[in-house]
Amino acid sequence: MKDEVVVVTGLAAMEPLIVHRMIVERTAAGTMIIETWTTAHTHESMAVRRASMSMTTHLKSKVQRIPTRPPRAPRLSVGGGGGTGTVPLARQASPETATIGTRTIGPSKGRRRRRRMRRRRRRRPVTSSC
């Protein structure tokens, strides 16, 4: 059985992020590394770095097999696009805010209020002063 093992090193702030990928073959006799290759992404974006960090959980010396599985839907829908979260659609409010039961996750109330005010202000015609 062949596995692809991905080891990510260089997760400190400005270290280049290096991904070592190894094809590991598991037989009855034991495990054997068939080939390794390295892809170096210098100064990868923090998002990628954070993702890989949570993926490998401080991989410095350990080798951990990261199963290649399709990304699951995010737990909460992130603004726009409507019900992308795992919330049943019946309970979902506007696409802007994902509602779980009664708890709303989304833009803060302040921002919403501000937007409402702006909308109200725009509608009134400007009276010319002359």
Swiss-Prot record:
**Does the keyword Nucleus feature in the UniProt annotation?**
yes
Q: Where is the composition biased (Basic residues)?
A: 109-130
- What positions belong to coiled-coil segments? none
Which residue stretches belong to region Disordered?
61-130
What are the alphabetically sorted keywords of the record?
Nucleus
* Any one of the GO CC terms: nucleolus
Instruction: Give a GO biological-process term.
Output: vascular associated smooth muscle cell proliferation
Query: What is its subcellular localisation?
Result: Nucleus, Nucleolus
Keyword Phosphoprotein in record: no
- Sequence intervals crossing the membrane: none
Major location (coarse): nucleus
Additional detail: MINAS-60 is the product of an alternative open reading frame (alt-ORF) of transcripts coding for the RBM10 (AC Q99KG3) protein. MINAS-60 and RBM10 ORFs are overlapping and are formed by shifting the reading frame.
Its quaternary organisation is:
Interacts with 60S ribosome assembly factors GTPBP4 and MRTO4.
Q: What does this protein do?
A: Acts as a late-stage inhibitor of pre-60S ribosome assembly by preventing pre-60S ribosome export from nucleus.
Protein name (database record): Ribosome biogenesis inhibitor MINAS-60
Q: Give the species this sequence originates from.
A: Mus musculus
Lineage, top ranks: Eukaryota, Metazoa, Chordata, Craniata, Vertebrata
Q: Which gene encodes it?
A: Rbm10
